Amino acid sequence: MRILEYVGLDTSRVTAQYQKLVDALGRDDFRAAEVKKLVNVSHGKLYRAKLDYANRLLFCLVRHETEMCALMLEVIENHDYGHSRFLRGAAIDESRVVAIEAAAAGAEAQSVRYLHPQRTAIHVLDKPISFDDAQEAIYRQPPPLIVVGSAGSGKTALTLEKLKHIEGEVLYVTQSAYLARNARDLYYAGGFEHETQEASFLSYREFIESIRVPQGREAAWRDFRGWFERQRQAFRDLDAHQAFEEIRGVIAACVGGVLSRSAYQALGVRQSIFAPEQRQALYDLFERYRAWLPETGLYDLNLIAQEWASLAAARYDFVVVDEVQDLTAVQLALVLKTLIAPGQFLLCGDSNQIVHPNFFSWSQVKSLFWREPALAQRQQLRVLTANFRNADVTAQLANTLLKIKQQRFGSVDRESNFLIQAGGGEPGRVQLLSDKESATRELDARTRGSTQAAVLVLRDEDKSEARKHFATPLVFSVHEAKGLEYESIVLYRFVSDHRSEFAEIVAGVAETDLLLDTLEYRRARDKGDKSLEIYKFFINALYVAMTRAVRNLYLVEADTQHPLFRLLKLTLSEQAAIETHQASLEDWQKEARKLELQGKQEQASAIRNTILKHTPPPWPVLDERGLRESLTRVFREQVPGDKQKRRLFDYAACHDEPMLAQHLDREADFSPARGFAQQRASLANKYLTPYQARHFKDILRQCDLHGLEHRTAMNHTPLMAAAIAGNVALVEALIERGADRDASDHYGRNALHGALLAAFADGKFARSPFPALYELIAPASVDVKVAGRLVRIDRHLSEYFLLQTLWALFKSRFTHADRRPYCAFETATILQAWQHLPPSVVRAERNRRAHLSGVLARNEIDRDYPYNRALFARVTQGWYQFNPALEIRCRDADQSAWRPVLAALNLPLIHEFALEHSLPRIESYLAAAGLPSCAVPVALERRRAQQQRAAQRQSESHEPRWGTPQARQREMQKLQQRIDALRKSET
């Protein structure tokens, strides 16, 4: 087999042994190499080969078409699997690994779409990647750099690999939050670490928030459309879509500031969609729009970018802007303003994919750099023409569409003047079908049960008609489909519902004009022709929609004789040739979660409502509402019987609430609570037993019935319960189905916090299975708001694990008698909690008092430190608590909101079960955070009332003598109380 090497492989200490081993693997002699399969690794098929007595080589197998290759990943020195990057904390017992032959291992090889015929250097993100010659040249090109490439050209993977070589503070920013999150996960996949780099992966909105968090919510197209309908009477001659593009892409997008009315009126013919005589009305609409935004709690990112320009400071050593065509000029200028050194950037995108209203052009982007001649001379542009996503026939169809676009409108710019080259190797299928009931019925029957087939329409308002014919929940407009890909795509009435626009697009284009294999740069014949700007959306939307299909594309049209189809060489098919895989409930669960993460809540909800059809669990859940109801019934109303008391006692055991058990004993006369310390472990285990089992089909069946995020009786999700139980296999199964790592209980604790508490209490749990759990369930980052701006704490920062530790232990500061009176944290407390954690979770240099004290001190409020995140407040010397002014972003499905940190941790509920000496400290923390004070805990109400009555009787028994000043004052108080009571009764 062919030998490949990971670009980061270091064999310098074992050169001779390595060469001998490679020779054996090259001739498929796994026995000589002593190859064994690592059986308990969940992320891929990994093997180890013996270099010598102490050292091992980690590798995997990949297959390209019929060629089998061994990819050398990492040298494991001295059997130290715990420090392996690629094993990510998995515990390896060499006595349990099994020998394997080359043929058996080859059957499990990972398939790759492309492999360079000569080069053996392989990059690794979430999978092995081999660069073609164009990608390799860009990889070695210094900045500044602009990379132009079609969908599936590998732009993102290439930019991430280039980013790995940059030191300092770096930024990756793109319009889509999902793409930013996915890029971050790809970047750190395989355990990648960069000690001298701090990387931020942000959507553009999050980038804006990192400067200052705007008030309200971003205004979307749907918001504008609804508002525009109410203005239509005054603006009958304006089209909503064109008006939105003009406001977003022209008036509000200028780098020098929002265009004045006169400046807008003076724009050239090609600089605006609208004719000069229409611009007065359009500017009137813009002024109304600008006034409407704050009235409804909305904001426009362009207008915010204009305002925030004065706040942006030079911060980043390097910036990557992905999908740059989705940004306006002012948005891009704001990003580049945060560079410390001009020119340290990489921009990548494809102007043929523009479906957002922004009036983008590469020439406009480059004009930002021409203001600095030295930078303009250095700036280089490279084009990636290969497409590794789409089938050959789809790529050919997309190329024909690009030829039509160029013939009709001329070249958009020099940078976008290229055709794509299919590199995926799939032949694929494209069919044109008539919009008749028989054809749509057949397509619907084949697609409705598959997660690999989606229906696309041009605009949001077209989806309702498509849903009359297709029952799949996967119906998207083009704006929504950006960034998606499915094996089969159905385009519904793209052309038929817009006959005139597409007729105008193909006007004057002949079949002979499309015979060229390349695009020659040429400008439009008429410089005053604005057709491209008017019709750009339609042709780009069709291009984007086509390229969402990985293998099969079906165009369903009423007008199958439209001249566009003749130019595309599409002939009518009588029957759809489509084969789809019928998805399981597990497949639909994963699809729903993926769409939620991408912000496609409409389609995710449709999956849950029409396919998954989850029902609420039949058991009562002790969430905060249920808990407070039980407290009221037991302690305030004193309802007879032990049922509610037993529920509260079980709750105390599961959530470690010793004071609640004490209240049940003393205030509710529940005698079993006296043995709380002895019974707690067994009672808590009762609720975890189903989640500890090796066979957990019943748990997965419950998830099918009630949803992945249903709650147990103790208000845990299945993922939380599995993590606390330490069941790695169940956690993997739930994560694979799309379980939400961020879901939290009524104390703001997620699955990671539950597992942390188990690891802190049990050294065996900390050593195994916690390292594997941590890799699976730790959220990628935590978003906090400090001094009005977003601060993202990534999982690779020291502050991340410290914050998660304090979050998990927060409640115990107030509820356990062995804690100090400050209700805060010191380094000794944290180090004690971490004492059993392996280096794969907390690196050895971070698990030291000096380092920990430094992290706490440098993140203290008002500390003069450049990267101070102001996470903590010092209570007294050496004792810290969360900064009370801190806010945290709490996510619920597709919604997110900022909450004060003490509210997110639910300090008011903690107050109900806190030690009595902790109550004043809780009140002071709440006051510092600007939160309301708490009433007397429900369990203590009767005792406090008794104490007050006793105090009153004591006071009355020592009444002052009649005639003394004290007696007169007392009588005046009584008289005033009677007057107040009388007035209250009269009102």
Question: Which residues fall in each region the model found?
Answer:
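Ankyrin-repeat boundary/"N-cap" motif
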Residues: F676-K686, L708-P718, S744-L757, R789
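Ankyrin repeat domain, specifically the short helix-to-loop turn at the C-terminus of the second helix
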Residues: I699-G707, E732-D740, P769-S781
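Basic, Lys/Arg-enriched alpha-helical interface segments
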Residues: M1-R56, L61-D126, L397
